[in-house]
Every structure is written in structure tokens, then in C-alpha cells.
Amino acid sequence: PAASEGGNERHAAFNNANTAIEGVDPDALYLLSSTSEAYSWLIKLLCDAGDAVLAPKPGYPLIESIARLECVDTVEYQLQFDGSWFIDIAELERLLSEPGGERIRALVLINPNNPTGSYVKPTERARIVTLCREHGIALIADEVFFDYSLEPFPGNARLAGERGVLTFALDGFSKMLAAPHAKVGWIQVSGPAEDVAEAQRRLDVIADDYLPMSDIIAERIPALLNAAPAQTR
């Protein structure tokens, strides 16, 4: 749906080597021109005009800007600090349960967060996955800075490959290679099989309409993947 078969298979092999969950299906990967484009696709996929997404504060102003272009609101949840940064799960529960919470279609996690550098901790992850499942919302995990470990808590792990709830994990070369001009991003879709199948049917339509990845760029992906580990040491 997004690039050459060989390009997707190489990405799957790379993701298998860099996540705790083996067996990435090449068909679960969507290659795009950037992770910014990935946000746009996912908001189109998950939201109608007037819906909302949850996004962290501090976080990217870009998320609100892209959501606004899709006529979607951003509801902020505040990260808290008690010596280290953490997600206030009670606040997430309140935002999803209060009047207007039914408009929320996705929760954005930035793992690790920019600008705080804080990772999603294992206990937070478990509760957030349960919360998203209970409220029928998707999880968008932005992991472009994952390999830059400023807060090495035990149990730091990618959300890519999460099976407990419909999850869209974002990554890309511009951060992985420390090269802002290397504008290639991707989405990895995971979660319960039925939810993934339905999401991919719809995401395929978006991918086929935009056709963001040319073979000229895809042919360079193997070399970029090989260069990635050295760039983040």
C-alpha cells in the first residue's frame, strides 16, 4: 500500500531487530514522506470533523496544527513532574469520561516525549492500553526519538507492536539518522486482529490516493537502515 515490497520487508526486518515483539508483518508498515504526513493520515482515518484527539503537554505544537487542518480539536493532557516526568492516568480517565469525551478518537503518546525526554513507563503503558480499549479509542505512538535514551528507566520499550489495543506507531529517518533532510517516515499498525484488518482496509484507501513513496526513494532505504545504528550510538 505504501512502497515497494522489498522496502517494506527490509523495514520489517529492521523493526524486528529493534523491538521486543518479533514478527513484524511487512504489510503492517506504511511508508510515507514524513511522520507529519503520518499524523495527517491517521487523523483522517480515525476522526470526523469536530472530533478530538488527546495529546500531551508539553509536546509538539505540530499535532494541534495538523489536527486543525483536518477540522479536528486537540485536547491536552498535562504531564506531571515529581523528580521525573509521568502521565497522570486519572486525568486521562477524567477527560475521556467527562461531557465531550465521546468526541475523542485517539490518544497520542510521544515515547520519549519531546521536550521532556521521558519515556512511557511500563505501569503507565498497561493502564493506558486498558483505558483506550475500554473507551474504544486508538493509540498513536510517536517514537521518532526512541533511540535517544535520556531517561533510562528499566522497562523502557517501544509501543510498536502493541497487541492490546489498535496502535499506530510512528518512526522515521530524520531523527533516526540525525538528518533533518532525510524525510522518510512510516506507520506500523498493530492490535487486535479484527481492528487491525478494518483499520488497514481504510488506511489502504488513503495510501492509494496519496501514493507518497517513489521507487527512487525506496531504493535507498536499505542503505539508510544500515546506517541507522551508528547514528544513534
Regions found by a protein language model. Give the residues of each.
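Phosphate-binding glycine-rich loop
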Residues: A3-A52
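Conserved PLP-anchoring active-site segment centered on the Schiff-base-forming lysine
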Residues: L45-A67
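Hydrophobic residues in well-ordered beta-strands that form the structural core
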Residues: A55, E76, L139-A141, A169
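Helix C-cap/helix->beta junction micro-motif
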Residues: E70, E134-H135, R163
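Conserved core segment of the aminotransferase class I/II
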Residues: G161-R233
